[in-house]
Design a protein with these regions (language model features):
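Cleavable N-terminal export/targeting peptides
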Residues: 1-47
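Short glycine/proline- and aromatic-enriched beta-strand/turn motifs that initiate or cap beta-hairpins
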Residues: 33-106, 267
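Residues on the lipid-exposed face of transmembrane beta-strands in outer-membrane beta-barrel proteins
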Residues: 52-54, 92-98, 138-142, 156-158, ...
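Extracellular/periplasm-exposed beta-strand and loop segments of Gram-negative cell-envelope proteins
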Residues: 61-87, 107-135, 161-185, 213, ...
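Solvent-exposed loop/turn segments connecting transmembrane beta-strands
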Residues: 84, 148, 209-220
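Repeated loop/turn-to-beta-strand initiation elements of outer-membrane beta-barrel proteins
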Residues: 100-105, 147-150, 200-204, 232-235
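Transmembrane beta-strand segments that form the barrel wall of outer-membrane beta-barrel proteins
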Residues: 202-216, 241-242
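Predominantly the C-terminal beta-signal and adjacent terminal strand-loop region
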Residues: 217-267
Length: 268
């Protein structure tokens, strides 16, 4: 049963966060001349404004999962196999904003079934993994800078994770062996969120968050492009990646989930 060097993987995950954090702050440096129409100037809201954003997420999954009874195993779902392995992947976000202050909520649910071959010499030939992951973030933000069509917020909060995995071995001397386990943990995360209005109806946004707590590492990064096709409602497309490294009493969840997202947001 193969195990991955957790320190090396943790370092690689940490490096994934840096480009996204830079992207979130870098939206401020986009030249206004790039837009054919002058972008709107942000006006601090005097009353509460609410934004609701449901998405579909074509998330691939890659990393180590394990239980005390089965040991730690590697699983992956490449983008080309998402249609086969991904059962459900949805997420929704909400924001309430007044002036420079904002309240944020983010919910995510992913259900996957992966099938991977095991290396020569392993006691089984194939491994099937049923994985369900639920993640919820609740936090707040404060606007650090507003200039023209750009805004940069500092963001922080608490993320709660729930993961349930079942491992089934096929072939070899342990054909039919299986094990399942579940865990819940809580992390604190912080980072930056940025927006830049390319035109009055087209907007680029990004965020990068990282932290930890009960897990060794918790991170989340995304870049989105939105088009307001009618006042108050926008179509959104982009890419999101998030990961966590949690280990406790033989339970291992050291996984990166990433892929394109497509959805809408409504502002009220």
């Amino acid at each position: 049963m193969a195990m991955m060097n957790c320190d090396n993987l943790q370092n690689r995950l940490a490096w994934r966060v840096l480009p996204a954090a830079l992207l979130a702050s870098g939206v401020l440096s986009l030249p206004a001349a790039a837009a054919q129409v002058a972008p709107p100037v942000y006006q601090p809201a005097e009353e509460w404004q609410f934004t609701v954003s449901p998405y579909l997420w074509a998330a691939g999954i890659r990393g180590d999962v394990g239980h005390r009874s089965t040991g730690t195993q590697f699983m992956k779902t490449d983008f080309s196999a998402i249609a086969r392995d991904l059962d459900v992947a949805v997420m929704g976000m909400g924001e309430a904003r007044k002036g420079p202050y904002s309240l944020l909520m983010d919910l995510m649910f992913i259900d996957t079934t992966t099938r991977n071959g095991l290396p020569d010499g392993a006691p089984a030939s194939r491994l099937k993994v049923d994985s369900r992951t639920v993640s919820g973030f609740l936090g707040g933000g404060y606007t650090l800078l507003e200039e023209g069509g750009a805004r940069l917020d500092a963001t922080g909060g608490v993320r709660v994770w729930y993961s349930s995995t079942s491992l089934h071995f096929q072939g070899g001397i342990i054909d039919g062996a299986s094990g399942s386990d579940r865990a819940t943990w809580v992390d604190g995360v912080a980072g930056l969120r940025g927006q830049y209005a390319l035109t009055p109806t087209v907007r680029l946004s990004a965020w990068g968050l990282a932290g930890g707590g009960q897990s060794r590492l918790d991170w989340d990064a995304a870049a989105l492009l939105s088009w307001e096709f009618t006042p108050g409602f926008s179509a959104v497309a982009g890419y999101r990646a998030m990961g966590g490294d949690y280990r406790h009493n033989g339970f291992v969840y050291d996984v990166v989930q990433q892929g394109p997202i497509l959805g809408m947001n409504g502002r009220f």
